[in-house]
Amino acid sequence: MSITFLIITCTSCSFEGTSLVTAGRYLWNDNGRTFQFDRRLGLCLDCNKVVAIEDLPDAETMERARSIRQTYVGQPLFSFIEPDYAKYLASQDGFDVLEQVIELNRQPVCLQCGKSAVRPINRPEGLTGETPVSLNLGHPWCSGTLQMQTSGGLRIGVRPETHVYNIHGRLISTYDE
């Protein structure tokens, strides 16, 4: 499978990262139960690089998902088809694992080192492969600002991997799909 990607650079130094770090499947596992969770692009202040970080649902979404879960019958829904994120979450196998993670009341963690010193990176409007767009995010290791652009027509072949974590965000295993 080949995909386009985003490129993150700094205006003042040679720092570079890509959105390819978010490729693959990410699972929480607890006592044999699993839940496939969402991740997003972030900057880890401990790893000093662009990484995948957990994307935890907010309290309102979780409350709605719990309510929907009580009466939901049917197969798990696909996130790219179901517009209601709470309904999507409620339909998923292993929802109890998600609830355990939320009950820990912890911050999202870096999915490389497991620490919570992360800053989410939001995709700005108007991205192209021609001119980088500012992320309005200072680069912590120099005086520069981070910027983003698309890979344009460049596509990279990725080998899908599954990453399995415990409910505290610590990596247990990684395997090829």
Short names for language-model regions:
Residues L6-V97, L104-V158:
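Short recognition patches in nucleic-acid-associated and regulatory proteins
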Residues C142, G152-E177:
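Extended, charged low-complexity segments
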